[in-house]
């Protein structure tokens, strides 16, 4: 079993444990089957569970436990109830961007309730929810790092005395800047995923493909990312204590890096920069070249509209300019 499959299985098991601990009814569990990313399914469950607990607390669903909820209970929930939930959450400090995401999750869940024969729900009430959150696109300037932040991060890594840590972390930063990979995709990279001698060098990573099935897809490399990986492979060839031989990146003990390890690198050296901010930085640079179809392919978006809505923004490149005016 490869790393990516292990992570999926681990998250799938974690989700199932939550179902068992909360005694979640089967008709609710069924909704999560079609969410291919089990990590995503966990986040969906957290949001849906929170809404259901709130509905029970307000006696809109007249039950005291998740296990007692029946399909008929959803017939009592109205769009105004969900609007009030979202308003209350915002007043409690939850960000409008997060709440907009939750609203989308609830819409997906109610579409399932409407579709399944096990539930009497006849319409997707979320369509009439009046709460207006903030699109993640409106928060774009907070999503990508400034050139100053990136330079400071690189300089801080360069000061690390431990050669292995210094070399590896610099390479990781360059690869992320040149691919837009997610942490999980970088952690899951195997030696067999590297195609560095092709006319256009690329790596393969597992993403959602057609019909939401997970499949290996190419991500093409910038010149610097290609050079960085080649430099790492040369350095890697001189290391003696590699345990996970398939892994491209690993820790000092020779074991594959995981997502938390990569996040820790950015916590230590990043000056507030996160791996996902690097992904936004890469995506915005790519989108501003004008080739949106290629950018969509590189990021693994299902629709070019997602790319347009999130990454074609005139503010890119202006953060440092404005700060120095």
Where are these regions (language model features)?
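Active-site/catalytic core of tyrosine-dependent DNA strand-transfer enzymes
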Residues: 222-272
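Basic, Lys/Arg- and aromatic-enriched nucleic-acid-binding interface segment
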Residues: 151-183
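Short basic/aromatic active-site micro-motif
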Residues: 167, 255, 271-289, 302, ...
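Alpha-helix N-cap/helix-start motif at helix boundaries, enriched for small hydrophobics
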Residues: 106, 172-173, 180, 184-189, ...
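Short, polar N-cap/turn motifs at the start of nucleic acid-interacting alpha helices
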Residues: 194-196, 271-272, 290-315
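Conserved tyrosine-mediated DNA breakage-rejoining catalytic core shared by Y-recombinases
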Residues: 184, 188-228
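N-terminal core-binding DNA-recognition domain of tyrosine recombinases/integrases
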Residues: 10, 24-39, 48-140, 159
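DNA breakage-rejoining catalytic core of tyrosine-based enzymes
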Residues: 75, 135-153, 211-223, 240-245
């Amino acid at each position: 079993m490869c790393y990516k499959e292990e992570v999926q299985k681990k998250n799938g098991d974690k989700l199932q444990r939550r179902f068992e601990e909360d005694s979640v009814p089967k008709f609710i569990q069924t909704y999560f089957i079609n969410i291919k990313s089990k990590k995503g399914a966990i986040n969906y469950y957290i949001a849906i569970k929170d809404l259901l607990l709130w509905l029970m607390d307000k006696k809109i669903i007249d039950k005291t436990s998740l296990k007692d909820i029946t399909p008929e209970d959803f017939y009592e929930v109205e769009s105004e109830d969900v609007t009030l939930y979202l308003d209350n959450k915002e007043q409690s400090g939850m960000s409008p961007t997060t709440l907009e995401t939750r609203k989308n999750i609830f819409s997906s869940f109610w579409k399932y309730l409407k579709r399944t024969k096990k539930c009497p729900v006849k319409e997707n009430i979320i369509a009439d929810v009046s709460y207006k959150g903030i699109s993640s696109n409106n928060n774009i300037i907070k999503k990508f790092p400034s050139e100053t932040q990136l330079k400071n991060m690189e300089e801080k890594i360069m000061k690390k005395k431990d050669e292995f840590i210094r070399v590896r972390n610099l390479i990781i930063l360059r690869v992320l800047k040149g691919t837009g990979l997610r942490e999980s995709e970088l952690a899951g990279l195997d030696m067999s995923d590297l195609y560095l001698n092709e006319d256009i060098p690329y790596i393969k990573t597992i993403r959602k493909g057609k019909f939401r099935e997970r499949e290996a897809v190419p991500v093409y490399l910038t010149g610097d990312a290609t050079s960085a990986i080649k430099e790492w492979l040369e350095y890697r060839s001189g290391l003696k204590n590699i345990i996970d031989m398939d892994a491209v990146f690993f820790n000092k003990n020779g074991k594959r890096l995981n997502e938390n390890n990569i996040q820790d690198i950015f916590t230590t050296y990043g000056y507030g920069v996160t791996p996902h901010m690097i992904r936004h930085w890469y995506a915005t640079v790519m989108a501003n070249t004008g080739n949106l179809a290629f950018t969509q392919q590189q990021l693994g978006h299902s629709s070019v509209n997602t790319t347009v809505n999130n990454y074609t923004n005139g503010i890119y490149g202006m953060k440092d300019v404005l700060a120095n005016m």
